[in-house]
A protein has these predicted regions:
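Sec/Tat signal peptide C-region and signal peptidase I cleavage site
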Residues: 22-28
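Amphipathic, charged alpha-helical segments and their helix-to-coil junctions
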Residues: 30-67, 87, 91-123
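N-terminal secretory signal peptides that target proteins for export/translocation
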Residues: 1-4
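Short, well-ordered alpha-helical segments
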Residues: 69-84
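A generic structural signal for short
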Residues: 24, 68-69
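Hydrophobic alpha-helical segments, especially transmembrane helices
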Residues: 9-10, 25, 77
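N-terminal export leaders
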Residues: 6-16
Length: 123
């Protein structure tokens, strides 16, 4: 999917080994938020983005889902900032590395992801 880049790949490996999987950055997320987002991913309305955050494949008017996505993205931002500080990179690089690892290891068939060019694709 994404081409390998040594620095990003190394950071992705660090993220995977240091924190579990980059898909679990929102350790403080509520189980209801996670359930809402997982259902939306299955329905094809929410997907993973190349920057490491969740995004809407289809715009939504559901305030509960919007809040759940925001909650998870906020937790991911904290994790990326913490990881960046520890490894001397920017939070953006940490997010991209996490997304790359997620795209390669955690996306299920049928899941949507937004590539680096901004195009939504289905695995």
């Amino acid at each position: 999917m994404l081409r390998s880049h040594p620095t990003r790949r190394a950071l992705a490996i660090l993220l995977l080994t240091a924190m579990g999987t980059p898909v679990r950055p929102a350790l403080a997320q509520s189980s209801s938020s996670k359930a809402l987002v997982e259902a939306a991913k299955t329905a094809g309305t929410v997907g993973e983005q190349a920057d490491g955050y969740l995004g809407f494949v289809i715009p939504q008017d559901d305030p509960g889902l919007t809040a759940a996505v925001a909650e998870i993205n906020t937790a991911r931002a904290r994790l990326y900032a913490e990881t960046a500080r520890r490894h001397g990179v920017s939070p953006e690089v940490a997010g991209v590395a996490a997304a790359k690892a997620l795209f390669e290891t955690k996306l299920r068939p049928g899941d949507y992801y937004r590539d680096a060019t901004g195009v939504w694709r289905r695995k």
